[in-house]
Amino acid sequence: MKVAVLPGDGIGPEVTEAALKVLRALDEAEGLGLAYEVFPFGGAAIDAFGEPFPEPTRKGVEEAEAVLLGSVGGPKWDGLPRKIRPETGLLSLRKSQDLFANLRPAKVFPGLERLSPLKEEIARGVDVLIVRELTGGIYFGEPRGMSEAEAWNTERYSKPEVERVARVAFEAARKRRKHVVSVDKANVLEVGEFWRKTVEEVGRGYPDVALEHQYVDAMAMHLVRSPARFDVVVTGNIFGDILSDLASVLPGSLGLLPSASLGRGTPVFEPVHGSAPDIAGKGLANPTAAILSAAMMLEHAFGLVELARKVEDAVAKALLEAPPPDLGGSAGTEAFTATVLRHLA
């Protein structure tokens, strides 16, 4: 288990250390053979090397089996040219590893339904995974451009691009509730028709997983009206960008949301939240998303599904027993992490 750890900026080092404490405890109990090395990334790397994704970090990522990332950015670096800002390091990291699938779970933890903007009876039981295609579609399609009179972008997908992200979704569903919803706009767009047909072809290789199709506008409505009925949702880049942000508000705090980016190279696991420089160093950061990102790493990088579920269960118990400040409690980073570790033991 060789992991490159990129703590980053702001609260990144604090929440990443919390995740590492959990991983070290599991390693001691289960003999996982955990080996990790810490590398500078984002603003911290700019301060040390003059660029957000320097060569030593790049080499460390290439040699690792997984990347555990904290958070990047902060007002200190906002005045830099765009091409060397901390956030540019994220784009370079994802591109260098050809990470084509972004996994964003949104789970309303039992007992915390009150945090959701939805009614408690609607929020109860929500546990949805959005699988977003990350490197194709209208964000990257050519031609694109703008003149004084008009602007244009191209929505384009190849069969291999759709097939590979669909497989990620079906494989994830096999470990969950065995239900995939594919989201498109096949009633209007040829790309949507192509997407739907290709996902259906991939789905035939997973007879144990149910496949359903939804138009993106209807799906947005369903995620608000009845989100608990969904398991795994797979869609293209722009629709996934929108739907994953919609789903992210369901649990009630960004501090609860992990993510994974998978592809041909080293997979990356990171919290959805930002660097929160206003609370950095105060011991107040909620490490839940970082700990759950480590759980996703156990599952998707190393196939340790049972251990990942064990971490998730410990986090769920800790959230009820010792909620962090952003959830209305008073448990700081260390106290919350200690509670998770106690429930893991």
UniProtKB/Swiss-Prot annotation:
Reactions accelerated catalytically: (2R,3S)-3-isopropylmalate + NAD(+) = 4-methyl-2-oxopentanoate + CO2 + NADH
- Principal location class: cytoplasm
Annotated localization = Cytoplasm
Query: Domain of life here?
Result: Bacteria
* Molecular-function GO term, any one: magnesium ion binding
Named in its record, the pathway it takes part in is:
Amino-acid biosynthesis; L-leucine biosynthesis; L-leucine from 3-methyl-2-oxobutanoate: step 3/4
Provide the residue positions that the database annotates as binding substrate.
Answer: R94, R104, R132, D217
Q: How does it assemble?
A: Homodimer.
Q: What is this protein called?
A: 3-isopropylmalate dehydrogenase
Q: Which gene encodes it?
A: leuB
